[in-house]
């Protein structure tokens, strides 16, 4: 392709790109339909401040450039990462996409991260705590970052994920950042099956949350179980709510008061009798 004829695209930050992307992917599926491309590019060009007189001409060129350089999938869906690279710098692209390319496997893993960065146990992640999370994230991916850039990216992430604009992230905001997979407990219907089926399901559930394989749930394992249990009846929970329910669960289930929930203790709480 003759590069002299390609439109030169400006650069947005991740927050600007996300603002446009959400218009087309409101429920965060991670893709838009190919038929929406024209409208998407039009909104992006408007966001970049493209002059109205050249916008329509550029629209065709930008779409042509995308279709030529990207291996668009055959299912008519355009993934976020296929479009983000056209408008974002490498670091901004990483900020937006790391969550989709490194999804968490379980709520236990999620709660380990939550407890680590909610250092003051306030039930929220402050801007300073988010900065620490991002610093560790860049280090983990072997990416060098200056303190000035780190400050800038912290602000960008707050713009994207702090939905109520109170300057801090709650449990649900962080779950969106980390692309937590679907609630494990949704696949079970404990009240709609036989005793044997309930016992079998209980074994699967306990094995899933007992990540350390000690025969007891402790620390983030209890947190992960509590989070998923609560979200079955209340889709949006806060860190403060989670801590309260965790305390109630331990009070009722932790019979020997060791701060853990043994397998037999949890079974008793759920009204099951299991073989020792």
Curated annotation (Swiss-Prot):
Gene Ontology MF term list: calcium ion binding
GO cellular component terms attached to this protein's record: cytoplasm; cytosol; dendrite; extracellular region; nucleus; synapse; terminal bouton; transport vesicle membrane
Gene3D superfamilies, alphabetized: EF-hand
Main location: cytoplasm
Residues annotated for Ca(2+) 6 binding in this entry: 254, 256, 258, 260, 265
Domain EF-hand span(s) in chain numbering: 12-47, 58-93, 105-140, 149-184, 197-232, 240-276
Domain of life: Eukaryota
Tissue expression from the record: Expressed at high levels in the pancreatic islets of Langerhans and to a much lesser extent in the gastrointestinal tract (stomach, small intestine and colon), the adrenal medulla and cortex and the thyroid C-cells. In the brain, the expression is restricted to distinct subtypes of neurons with highest expression in the molecular layer of the cerebellum (stellate and basket cells), in the anterior part of the pituitary gland, in the thalamus, in the hypothalamus and in a subgroup of neocortical neurons.
Keyword annotations of the record: Calcium, Cytoplasm, Cytoplasmic vesicle, Membrane, Metal-binding, Repeat, Secreted
Name recorded for this polypeptide: Secretagogin
UniProt source species: Homo sapiens (Human)
